[in-house]
Amino acid sequence: MSASSQSRPTTIACLLGPTASGKTAAALALAARRPIEIVSVDSALVYRDMDIGTAKPSRDERASVPHHLIDIIDPADAYSAAEFRADTLRLIGEIVARGRTPLLAGGTMLYYKALTQGLNDLPGADPEVRAALDADAARDGWPALHARLAQVDPDTAARLAPNDSQRIQRALEIFMLSGQPMSALLAAPRRTDDAAAAYRFVPVALEPSDRAVLHARIAQRFDAMLDAGFIDEVERLRRRDDLHPDLPSMRCVGYRQAWEFLDGDTDYRTMRDKGIFATRQLCKRQITWLRAMPERIVVDCIAPDSTARALDALERVLDGRTPD
């Protein structure tokens, strides 16, 4: 046996929660007490020039504690769960080697699942296949492609809305490249490796005891983003020749709705309402993912002392005062 297989895994604290649950405040509170470096678990924060609509940590916040996996790619590019897993495992090793403590923080549960449970053996993105599907959608509409998906992968089609362009495209792409439905590939055993075996990931979950309070926070935060110049931010991105609404970056919550408004497809009030609704739907999905983790340590994110509670939970994890 190798020395690494005999040694006790290094515990990694993971601060997870839906949007507007107070993750940044809790992470910064921990940074004030311990030499941590924050590794973002957020699929929107990877993009440069998308600051307001992603609620990216401020320049001062990022100066007070090292942050990783923020502003690492251009909005015209894509970033996969596989890339996140490889980057995060590398960063954890580097942070530990520096004698500091990594803290994973974010709300992209697909990334967290890929990190901790491994990856499904799905084919990578193929630009030619995607271009062909985009052309079909432009001609026939996404509901027609949804109907096509229902013929080859009824299980996946049944859980997707007819206009969910990103997921419909990906499911059809997988079938065209592999000859197998995505649902069957996802049901297959995950591809595992020893890369994550050196670590024990412990999730601290910020969850609301009353969703109405979190929904009010979401509305307040979206309005604050609008006041801070979110529409201008999207307009600057829109003026680029290489961006369009079907890119993963522009599908981020809020950006799609702002793009529709700038295209003249909706009025301002409708854009605001749709942006808030989309954020609430994202929050609902994030909470569903969290509640499927029986090992998580739950902190009520709407409690008056939620930051202190989260800080205490994180310190208990890092001090080894949690059950194995």
UniProtKB/Swiss-Prot annotation:
Keyword Repeat found: no
Reaction catalysis annotation: adenosine(37) in tRNA + dimethylallyl diphosphate = N(6)-dimethylallyladenosine(37) in tRNA + diphosphate
Site keyed Interaction with substrate tRNA: positions: 108, 130
Highest taxon in the source lineage: Bacteria
Gene Ontology terms, MF aspect: ATP binding; tRNA dimethylallyltransferase activity
Positions of region (Interaction with substrate tRNA): 42-45, 166-170, 251-256, 284-291
Residues holding substrate: 19-24
Biological process annotations from GO: tRNA modification
Cofactor(s) named in the record: Mg(2+)
Keyword check for Amino-acid biosynthesis: no
Keywords: ATP-binding, Magnesium, Nucleotide-binding, Transferase, tRNA processing
Positions annotated to bind ATP: 17-24
Enzyme Commission code(s) on record: 2.5.1.75
Subunit structure: Monomer.
Listed NCBIfam families: miaA (TIGR00174)
Function comment: Catalyzes the transfer of a dimethylallyl group onto the adenine at position 37 in tRNAs that read codons beginning with uridine, leading to the formation of N6-(dimethylallyl)adenosine (i(6)A).
Homology family: Belongs to the IPP transferase family.
Protein name: tRNA dimethylallyltransferase
Organism: Burkholderia orbicola (strain MC0-3)
Designated gene of the protein: miaA
